[in-house]
Amino acid sequence: MDMPLKIWFVESGHSERKLLGRSAEEYLLREFSAFDTEKVVSEGECRFEEGRLDVVIPLDMPLVTVGDVERGAEYVKKHSLGVLALGGAASGAKIVRSEGGRSGYFISSPHFVKVDSAKNVRLVYNQLKERITDRLLEAGVFVFDPANTVVDDTVRIAAGAEILPFCKIEGDTVIEAGASVEGSHISDCRIEGGAKVVMSHLADTRVGAGSTVGPFARLRGAVVGKGCRVGDFVEIKNSVFGDGAKSAHLAYIGDADVGGGTNVGCGTVFCNYDGKWKHRTSVGRDCFIGANVNLVAPVSLGDGAFVAAGTTVTQDVEKDGFAIGRSRQVNKTRRAEGAEKDFGGGDKA
């Protein structure tokens, strides 16, 4: 007759160590969620009972699986053992059958490893990383180079998504089917279907379907709409970037609401900080912001507004308005009439 299992989790000083998005303790509690479990401060608090198998597992062994315990339980019953040490006597993990039997036996397993040293943390980290990657591959996620890809256990990636080399994806991140991420650090983000992120850093950001980000973009606290382009060396912070908006390169968009279809030119800066407070900028739909423009917040641009290159905007621009605020170009003669032309600036040989 099968004997029921009781799992005793013994608290440990290393149980809160974070590995790939979860603590060592969280991995164990999830793995054995279908079992009768109880947490205790020390092994002395365990209450072993006749007629069942009591399993003692320190909470700093995140690699232990249900299969490991079930194989150990079968070994105990088959060989009529009273105590079976799991992973060796020093591990602290064991299976106890209270009605007695032979003791002193142990079963070796690479999973009964504590995260109590730098060496063990490395071993456990890499095994967890491999498990996560295998699970993604089995689910239909294209992970092209697992050795150079790090994905937290908390991340959700749909079948059909592509994870290219040199990515670190962590936190509460969701990547939808058809999205592609390459060489990027992504934390607590949602990347919608068809979006492409290349060599960029994203945190607390949503990237809409069909949008492209990077290379070398930084987005934090941003909502990027559908079909947008966020190019190289563009930073978007605490801002909404409407559907179809574009910023191809070299811009800072901070504390702003940018309407759909708007173009933000190269070198544009949303000047959001006055030295003490942050202020927001509102840009309407289908605006054109030329190169090297400064938008000094708080300021707003109406739908269809046009801002000429090199302008510093300090006043609101009305709908379909045109703003230009730069020094007038003056062309002057470079030399007096009849003087010898000398662009070198030095004596002639």
Language model regions located:
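Glycine-rich hexapeptide-repeat left-handed beta-helix
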Residues: 32, 197-349
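Generic signal for short, ordered secondary-structure residues
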Residues: 11-12, 103, 107, 140-142, ...
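Terminal amphipathic alpha-helical/low-complexity segments used for targeting or macromolecular assembly
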Residues: 1-148, 153-155, 160, 166, ...
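Residues at structural and domain junctions
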Residues: 11-14, 18, 110-111, 149, ...
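Short glycine-/acidic-enriched loop or helix-start segments at secondary-structure transitions
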Residues: 66-68, 191, 207, 317
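Acidic, glycine-rich loop-and-beta core segments that form the ion-binding/anion-interacting portion
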Residues: 151-231
